[in-house]
């Protein structure tokens, strides 16, 4: 999807409003199709981004200890129901060979992956794999905690239920002590 088709989205929103028994021409709804199209362009902007692009700039730094950025806020849209889920991502890696990336790049990669119709599990593994493929670190850990509106406002209706996913690569997959250490840092 290279460009969002605003006209198609607007037509679809009108059809949905009519299908639920609303009048899309009534005050309050008349501009809703345009607003929804604009919103979708923003919230699905990650469809045109490769998270690895954010790691293109690599800095030489003799540091082979943990780098962890935690509590990165994000939002995404559940691909099953097209309703939001949101939470925090924690991204850590142990650099190898003097290859580090900017801290903001970790947050940008999370954002690029989250801004598309998505699954939490896929966000977690995609960010981890992008780091592995570009930086080739000793280890990577990504932990994502989120509340899914598809569980909060429909179906089971359990507000506040948190879903936690993790992806561990390299050292963090093979060394239980290293994994336990970073998980304790994430917990704070």
Swiss-Prot record:
Q: Give the enzyme's main class according to its UniProt record, as a single word.
A: hydrolase
Molecular-function GO terms, alphabetical: GTP binding; GTP cyclohydrolase I activity; zinc ion binding
The record's listing under SUPFAM superfamilies reads: Tetrahydrobiopterin biosynthesis enzymes-like (SSF55620)
Q: Which residues form a coiled coil?
A: none
Gene Ontology CC terms = cytoplasm
Q: Which residues bind Zn(2+)?
A: 78, 81, 150
InterPro entries the record matches: GTP-CH-I_C/QueF, GTP-CH-I_N, GTP_CycHdrlase_I, GTP_CycHdrlase_I_CS, GTP_CycHdrlase_I_dom
Q: Tell me what reaction this enzyme catalyses.
A: GTP + H2O = 7,8-dihydroneopterin 3'-triphosphate + formate + H(+)
Q: List the disulfide bonds.
A: none
An example GO BP is: one-carbon metabolic process
- List UniProt keywords, sorted A-Z: GTP-binding, Hydrolase, Metal-binding, Nucleotide-binding, One-carbon metabolism, Zinc
Q: List the EC numbers from the record.
A: 3.5.4.16
Q: Which HAMAP family match?
A: FolE
Against PANTHER family, the record matches this protein to: GTP CYCLOHYDROLASE 1, GTP CYCLOHYDROLASE I
Describe, as the record does, how this protein assembles with itself and its partners. Answer: Toroid-shaped homodecamer, composed of two pentamers of five dimers.
Q: Which family does it belong to?
A: Belongs to the GTP cyclohydrolase I family.
**NCBIfam families, from UniProt?**
folE, PRK09347.1-2, PRK09347.1-3
Instruction: Tell me the protein's name.
Output: GTP cyclohydrolase 1
- Species of provenance: Halalkalibacterium halodurans (strain ATCC BAA-125 / DSM 18197 / FERM 7344 / JCM 9153 / C-125)
Gene that this polypeptide is encoded by: folE
């Amino acid at each position: 999807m290279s460009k969002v088709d605003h006209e198609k989205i607007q037509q679809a929103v009108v059809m949905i409003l009519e299908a639920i028994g609303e009048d899309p021409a009534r005050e309050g709804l008349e501009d809703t199709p345009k607003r929804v199209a604009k919103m979708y362009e923003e919230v699905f902007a990650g469809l045109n981004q490769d998270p690895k692009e954010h790691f293109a700039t690599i800095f030489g730094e003799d540091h082979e200890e943990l780098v962890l950025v935690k509590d990165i806020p994000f939002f995404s849209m559940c691909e099953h129901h097209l309703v939001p889920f949101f939470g925090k991502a924690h991204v850590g890696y142990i650099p190898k060979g003097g290859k580090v990336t900017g801290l903001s790049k970790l947050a940008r990669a999370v954002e690029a992956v989250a801004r598309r119709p998505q699954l939490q599990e896929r966000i977690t593994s995609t960010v981890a794999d992008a780091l592995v493929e570009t930086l080739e670190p000793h280890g990577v850990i990504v932990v994502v905690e989120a509340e899914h509106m598809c569980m909060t406002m429909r179906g089971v209706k359990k507000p506040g239920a948190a879903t936690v996913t993790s992806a561990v690569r390299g050292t963090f997959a093979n060394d239980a002590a290293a994994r336990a250490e970073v998980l304790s840092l994430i917990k704070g």
